[in-house]
Amino acid sequence: MAKGGFPGGFGGGNMNNLMKQAQKLQKQMEDMQKDLETKEFETSVGGGAVSVTVTGKKEVKSINIKPEVVDPDDVEMLEDLVLTAVNEALRKAEEETASKMGKLTGGMPGGLF
């Protein structure tokens, strides 16, 4: 490791260069976050019986339930379908966020940003 530098040459010991890189990375992360917030993630379960759309902000935007799955004698099944669909849509949003963040910060020590 170079004296005063970071593993892999990040910054190369030049504090001014390191600050410029950090500012550039911060701007890229902000842009990526704005882009993700406008994206929508949809999933459906039960053969399309229940579909859910969430935003990149991880807010539920819509839940669609086909009338034929509404059975007053089996509310628990419908609850399970809705829960599964919501969790799957949120998982997709989280995976996309983690993937993009990983590409942007790849190789940096954890907790740096």
From Swiss-Prot:
Cystine connections: none
Coiled-coil region: none
Annotated region (Disordered), positions in chain: 1-31
Record localization: Cytoplasm, Nucleoid
InterPro entries: YbaB-like_sf, YbaB/EbfC
Organism: Clostridium botulinum (strain Eklund 17B / Type B)
Role summary: Binds to DNA and alters its conformation. May be involved in regulation of gene expression, nucleoid organization and DNA protection.
Biased composition (Gly residues): 1-14
Tree of life domain: Bacteria
Pfam families on file: YbaB_DNA_bd
CC terms in the record's Gene Ontology section: bacterial nucleoid; cytosol
Molecular function per GO: DNA binding
Subunit comment: Homodimer.
Family of the protein in this entry: Belongs to the YbaB/EbfC family.
Keyword check for Ion transport: no
Name under which the protein is recorded: Nucleoid-associated protein CLL_A3446
Alphabetized UniProt keyword annotations: Cytoplasm, DNA-binding
NCBIfam families xrefs: DNA_YbaB_EbfC
